[in-house]
Amino acid sequence: KQVSCINDPYGDVIKPESTMMLDYEVELALVIGKTCYQVSAEEASNYIFGYMICNDISMRDWQLHNMPDRVELMIGKSHDSHGPTGPWIVTSEEIADPHNLKINCYVNNELRQSSDTGDMIWDCFEQIEYLSSAMTLKPGDIITTGTPPGSGFSPRGASGKADKERKGNVFLEPGDLVKCEIESIGTIVNKIILG
């Protein structure tokens, strides 16, 4: 994501008229606390200042545009306002285990995503090891760690299993209210507006 997409934890999220497939993704966000390069997973925790929530808003049709056989991850995720984060940074000393936190997302009070950060494909420390193997991470850099099943683009519901009630994809519309919460961190809430 581009830094210009960062939004406050209660800011409105713009749904451009150019997208029909605006999606939500609750994610644990890591905030880097000191410069690191080629850091092992075993030492990665020493470089995390703290944790936040990120709603990794995505325009799925933009991601698939011109690339039907793969997903484009930059412009489809970097529109202005599409990176609400917060509600504050909880320091790493305050989170005993970042891989044991409940994580949920609601759209209009309907539970859409529900999981635990222990279900991540790559844990926080492995992600820092991988990223720092190729680039220097600087204080203030934010790493979003991936989302659980149940996004609007996913055929699976909050349980992670096929949702028989769900008829296809479910995307965001103006007026929708998206609430993302992570245990021990807090809650962010964003209203979708047409822009």
Label each residue range with its predicted role.
Residues 1-17:
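Extended, compositionally biased flexible segments
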